[in-house]
């Protein structure tokens, strides 16, 4: 199928293990309902008609993915991921074909809402650099004293945002920025930070705070609650 300027490829780095979950099974393969977290995350992307393909970067020794129904989906491409997130994203970008824009989404972020995704994708019509889903910080923020669990001072939360995913950029721009940042030893914690390092200023698209990443054991029950609530709302 030929791609158009509106078609989008998504990249899902899924080669990590997530030791904070305290389980032997990588967190993306834990189940919520009758699907794994990874499947929830990927199907949320494929639910939008502009997302024509999802490239999933998995660990070379991963034996779990092939057992999922997702492995046989015609819109899924699988590549070997790397040791770091940025390496996996770059591997995914190389398999993204001629898509002009790419989404990058966390494998363990299963609660993405379609209205948030649609507003993020609309950036391709108005922006040359793209942007990210993000949620304004609402809690009081404290800076700790170096090496201590003691408060140094309160941080002004005005203008602070929690970075979420998906993150959405022109494919070539993201590839070039990630490559440069890695080659120059920059600290890259998400895709937007690579663009920031290269002098770009991606936009912030406010998204729902319940678009959580499953990182700790208690997050699993919370994600299950959010997903169950969403399914109930869609069916009423």
Swiss-Prot record:
**Where are the residues marked Positions MEP for the nucleophilic attack as a site?**
157, 213
> Site annotated as Transition state stabilizer: where?
20, 27
Is Transferase one of the keywords UniProt gives this record? yes
Q: What reaction does this enzyme carry out catalytically?
A: 2-C-methyl-D-erythritol 4-phosphate + CTP + H(+) = 4-CDP-2-C-methyl-D-erythritol + diphosphate
Which parts of the chain span the membrane according to its record?
none
**What is a GO molecular function of this protein?**
2-C-methyl-D-erythritol 4-phosphate cytidylyltransferase activity
- One GO-annotated biological process of the protein: isopentenyl diphosphate biosynthetic process, methylerythritol 4-phosphate pathway
The EC designation for this entry is 2.7.7.60
| Keyword Nuclease annotated | no
Q: Which InterPro entries match?
A: IspD, IspD/TarI, IspD/TarI_cytidylyltransf_bact, ISPD_synthase_CS, Nucleotide-diphossugar_trans
Query: Where does the record place a coiled coil?
Result: none
Pathway it acts in?
Isoprenoid biosynthesis; isopentenyl diphosphate biosynthesis via DXP pathway; isopentenyl diphosphate from 1-deoxy-D-xylulose 5-phosphate: step 2/6
- Keywords noted in UniProt: Isoprene biosynthesis, Nucleotidyltransferase, Transferase
Q: What does this protein do?
A: Catalyzes the formation of 4-diphosphocytidyl-2-C-methyl-D-erythritol from CTP and 2-C-methyl-D-erythritol 4-phosphate (MEP).
**Assigned protein family:** Belongs to the IspD/TarI cytidylyltransferase family. IspD subfamily.
Q: How does it assemble?
A: Homodimer.
Query: Know the name of this protein?
Result: 2-C-methyl-D-erythritol 4-phosphate cytidylyltransferase
């Amino acid at each position: 199928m030929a791609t158009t300027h509106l078609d989008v490829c998504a990249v899902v780095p899924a080669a990590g293990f997530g030791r904070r979950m305290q389980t032997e099974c990588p967190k993306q393969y834990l189940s919520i309902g009758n699907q794994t977290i990874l499947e929830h995350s990927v199907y949320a992307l494929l639910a939008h008609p502009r997302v024509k393909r999802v490239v999933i970067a998995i660990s070379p020794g991963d034996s779990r993915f092939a057992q999922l129904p997702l492995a046989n989906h015609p819109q899924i491409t699988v590549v070997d991921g790397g040791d770091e997130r940025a390496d996996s994203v770059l591997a995914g970008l190389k398999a993204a074909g001629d898509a002009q824009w790419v989404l990058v989404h966390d494998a363990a972020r299963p609660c993405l809402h379609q209205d948030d995704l649609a507003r993020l994708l609309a950036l391709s019509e108005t922006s040359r650099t793209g942007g990210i889903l993000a949620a304004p910080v609402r809690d009081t923020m404290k800076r700790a004293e170096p090496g201590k669990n003691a408060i140094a001072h309160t941080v002004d939360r005005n203008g602070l945002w929690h970075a979420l995913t998906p993150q959405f950029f022109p494919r070539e721009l993201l590839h070039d920025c990630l490559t440069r940042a890695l080659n120059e030893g920059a600290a890259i914690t998400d895709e937007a930070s690579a663009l920031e390092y290269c002098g770009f200023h991606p936009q912030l698209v406010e998204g729902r705070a319940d678009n959580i990443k499953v990182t700790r054991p208690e997050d699993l029950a919370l994600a299950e609650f959010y997903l169950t609530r969403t399914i109930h709302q869609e069916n009423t």
